[in-house]
């Protein structure tokens, strides 16, 4: 049975460290 593939999440830019 073909399982739905999870959508690839684009890598998020690192949040700025304050």
Swiss-Prot record:
The keyword Secreted applies. Keywords: Antibiotic, Antimicrobial, Immunity, Innate immunity, Secreted. GO terms for biological process: defense response to Gram-negative bacterium; innate immune response. Induction: By bacterial infection. GO terms for cellular component: extracellular space. It is found in: Secreted. Belongs to the apidaecin family. Antimicrobial peptide active against many Gram-negative enterobacterial and plant-associated bacterial species. Not active against other bacterial species like H.pylori, P.mirabilis, B.pertussis or N.gonorrhoeae. This is Apidaecin +S. It comes from Vespula maculifrons.
